[in-house]
From Swiss-Prot:
CDD domains: PT_UbiA_Cox10
Family designation: Belongs to the UbiA prenyltransferase family. Protoheme IX farnesyltransferase subfamily.
Catalysed reaction, written as an equation: heme b + (2E,6E)-farnesyl diphosphate + H2O = Fe(II)-heme o + diphosphate
GO BP field: heme O biosynthetic process
Protein name: Protoheme IX farnesyltransferase
Localisation: Cell inner membrane
A molecular function GO annotation: protoheme IX farnesyltransferase activity
Chain ranges passing through the membrane: 28-48, 50-70, 95-115, 122-142, 150-170, 176-196, 221-241, 243-263, 282-302
Organism: Marinobacter nauticus (strain ATCC 700491 / DSM 11845 / VT8) (Marinobacter aquaeolei)
Additional record remark: Carbon 2 of the heme B porphyrin ring is defined according to the Fischer nomenclature.
InterPro entries reported for this sequence: Protohaem_IX_farnesylTrfase (IPR006369), UbiA_prenyltransferase (IPR000537), UbiA_prenylTrfase_CS (IPR030470), UbiA_sf (IPR044878)
Membrane topology note: Multi-pass membrane protein
Length: 302
């Protein structure tokens, strides 16, 4: 098997704080914190104490950032092959893998200290479990082992609303699990759409994403099926009395639009449509949770 190339390291003097920030995948962490904050705000009537909002999200962000750093290290060789990732700090050699792992360890330790001392142990251990699930189980094993990597590993990425919820209540509750289920159902169509757009790169890197192993048509059909499942799952907060009419209208509108993208992708098999589907999926998730939050402060359960 031909070894994947690793770019030559650059001189240490070129390292900046921006390189370390990039290791933490700040955009991904920001989306996770958005869903965590919404989980906190949905957990109880009114607004949680400022200390829970501050320290809870700080701890979650630190541990999420640590998981992202480990991902950079584990995927170093893969990242050098893909155009989207070849300029990452570890892939280019700007930051050595051991330095990155040390940085991840510091972030994880700080995150655990913040959550245990300032929030509660349940949230701390659940967040750590998410880190291990993403950085260990998914990145080290599932990503390279099965085309169902996203489906199985998606649970780790779906945890932030539950973490926010437990930060406020100190316990796992059914409505919090509904939020996890929504993100869990959203994950496959989100990543498979990107995988269709980047199919050649994933194949070159040896990652068995569904379009690589089973083809575009099979993947597009499964995107449609998961989008239908997501539409159904997204209505559960209304069905269970967690939310009201505002959320129902918003969830239907957003979900039907997502379904339209999925149908268009299945009919056209176009890389541009796949990319647009991927982009819309991000808008969908953010908008859905914002609508759920707005509904929470307007709707009063009977």
């Amino acid at each position: 098997m031909k070894a994947l190339p690793i770019q030559n390291p650059t001189h240490a003097s070129t390292i900046s704080w921006r390189d370390y920030l990039e290791l933490t995948k700040p955009r991904v962490v920001a989306l996770m914190i958005l869903t965590s904050v919404i989980g906190m705000l949905l957990a109880a009537p009114g607004v949680p104490e400022w200390s829970v909002l501050l320290f809870g999200n700080l701890g979650i962000a630190l541990l999420a950032g640590a998981a992202a750093v480990v991902n950079h290290v584990v995927d170093q060789k893969i990242d050098t092959v893909m155009a989207r990732t070849r300029k990452r700090p570890v892939a280019t050699g700007r930051i050595a893998p051991l330095d990155a792992l040390l940085f991840a360890t510091v972030l994880a330790a700080l995150g655990m200290v913040v959550l245990v001392w300032q929030v509660n142990e349940l949230t701390a251990w659940l967040t750590l479990a998410s880190l291990v699930g993403y950085a260990g189980v998914y990145t080290l094993f599932l990503k390279r082992a099965t085309p169902q990597n996203i489906v199985i590993g998606g649970l780790a990425g779906a945890m932030p609303p539950l973490l926010g919820w437990t930060a406020v209540t100190g316990q796992v509750e059914g409505h919090a699990l509904l939020l996890v289920l929504i993100i869990f159902a959203w994950t496959p169509p989100h990543f498979w759409a990107l995988a269709i757009h980047r199919k050649e790169e994933y194949a070159k890197a040896g990652i068995p994403m569904l379009p690589v192993t089973h083809g575009n048509r099979y993947t597009e059909l499964h995107i449609l099926l998961y989008t239908l499942m997501l539409l159904a799952v997204s209505l559960l907060p209304f069905v269970t009395g967690m939310s009201g009419g505002i959320y129902l209208v918003g969830a239907l509108a957003l979900g039907l639009r997502f379904l339209q993208y999925a149908v268009r992708l299945l009919r056209g098999d176009d890389r541009r449509v796949a990319l647009n589907t991927f982009k819309y999926s991000i808008t969908y998730l953010m908008a859905l949770f914002v609508v759920l939050l707005v509904d929470h402060f307007v709707f009063v359960p009977a």
